[in-house]
């Protein structure tokens, strides 16, 4: 997380790591957190040889063009987990001194979860073009 501290984070000039509110604008536009996850995930499954997600990859259409891929995460140590199952993205907003807000896409559902995790974890980030 320290690599993305602040809205500029690791993004190139003219871009920034989205805030929690900016992610909410996207999820609201796509129909709300309870149903927009499938619109943000790539389609296909590992088992069928057509994608990167494990079965069932519920509701995945990627109609938004977000192209969420299930990179999983790294824990506070050196363990990588949830690859093929989750796409986890940090926002630039802190929950507390040791925690940060993020968004999560899940292979078995169509929701987008608004969660907070230990800043020592390794989640993916997205860069959003400045207005």
Task: Please place each PLM-identified region on the residue numbering.
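Conserved positions within compact, well-structured domain cores
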Residues: 1-131
């Amino acid at each position: 997380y320290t690599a993305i501290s602040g809205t500029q984070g690791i993004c190139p000039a003219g871009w920034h790591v989205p805030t929690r509110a900016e992610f909410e604008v996207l999820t609201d536009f796509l129909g709300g957190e309870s149903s927009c996850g499938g619109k943000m995930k790539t389609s296909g499954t590992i088992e069928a040889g057509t994608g990167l997600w494990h079965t069932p990859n519920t509701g995945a259409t990627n109609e938004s063009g977000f192209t969420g891929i299930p990179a999983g995460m790294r824990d506070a140590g050196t363990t990588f987990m949830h690859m093929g199952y989750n796409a986890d993205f940090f926002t630039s907003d802190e929950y507390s001194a040791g925690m940060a807000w993020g968004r999560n896409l899940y292979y078995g559902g169509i929701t987008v979860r608004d969660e907070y995790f230990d800043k020592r974890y390794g989640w993916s980030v997205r860069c959003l073009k400045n207005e």
